[in-house]
């Protein structure tokens, strides 16, 4: 029964992931409404895009498209809220404490110092490199939903996160 209760407790890792993915989705929704997130400034029709429908993109005009943009914004809001609530439940200082303490987290401070080891510095820079690649490519090419760019970006980011977790495991043992 103990293993069952551990599965039902909120996870700070899962909460942080939900929060960051929700923020990223909200960012994409704003880009899609203002400029179009698909290539050549076209807008993404989110429902068809995720279900592999026939009309994954359309000509851009600065308006909300119902239900696509509304559903995507609601989904991003739910992920942000779930992440904030989960983080609030897992930490004594709550969500605000986690958010305000983020600049002092080992992953962030290791981008500017080797104090926590060269492995963690390398891991942190992998995360930065992945995010920078995605932002630069998407800005220069005006396409924010390119699967090839995602695959390169997520490879860098997840290897960086994984290497940071390995460093955390070394500290615990």
Region spans (language model):
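Alpha-helical transmembrane segments and their helix-start/interface "positive-inside/aromatic belt" motifs
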Residues: 5-26
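Membrane-interface segments at the starts/ends of alpha-helical transmembrane spans
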Residues: 51-74
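Alpha-helical transmembrane segments and their immediate juxtamembrane interface regions
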Residues: 149-173
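Membrane-helix interface motif
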Residues: 29-53
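Select subsegments of transmembrane alpha-helices in polytopic membrane proteins
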Residues: 17-21, 117-127
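Alpha-helical transmembrane segments and their membrane-interface junctions
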Residues: 30, 122-151
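Membrane-interfacial, low-structure loops and terminal tails that flank and connect transmembrane helices
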Residues: 1, 94-118
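Membrane-water interface of transmembrane alpha-helices
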Residues: 79-103
